[in-house]
Amino acid sequence: AIYNFTGAWASSAVAQHASFEHFTAAATQWSTVNGIDKNKIILGLPAYGIQFQSTSSPTGAVRKAYKVILTEYAADSPAEKDEIEKNGKIVFYNGHPLVQQKSDYVVDNGFGGILLNELSDDSEDDATSLLNVIYKTFIK
């Protein structure tokens, strides 16, 4: 799993919990440093976000399912973003742009695949589904 780099603990940054930079660094660690064949590595990404109650403190951060983010922030086109700041709160998650970037990286670099955690947190609508973005990348 390559996520949960930020959260509700006191020393946490108020930032993306599952960034592309963390994703590629972990992939490099497992393949290059640990010497595991890329085609045997399945890289994980979250179908949920972390909502911070303030843009300056991790206190009170909560996990939000991606499908809940889609509903709560419907007016903000959340599928096409990776973070939304509203009413003093900020939520970071993997929307279509970041999932596409990660999926392209996996395919272009010969990794074995992607694990989406937690699948039940994804949207069931093909237009907003994260799994659908991954699927379309792998069948190109």
How should each PLM-predicted stretch be described?
Residues V14, N87-N94, L115-S120:
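Active-site rim elements
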Residues A1-L70:
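Substrate-binding surface in catalytic domains of secreted glycosidases
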Residues A18-A25, V91-L98, D126:
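Soluble or luminal CAZymes and related metallo-dependent hydrolases
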Residues G95, Y105, S120-K140:
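Aromatic-rich peripheral "rim/lid" segments of glycoside hydrolase catalytic domains that contact
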Residues A25-T28, Q100-D104, D108, N132, ...:
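Solvent-exposed, polar/charged alpha-helical surfaces in well-ordered, non-transmembrane soluble domains
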Residues L43, V106, I114:
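Conserved, mostly hydrophobic/aromatic
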Residues G49, S56-F111:
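Hydrophobic, secondary-structure "cap" segments at the distal end of domains
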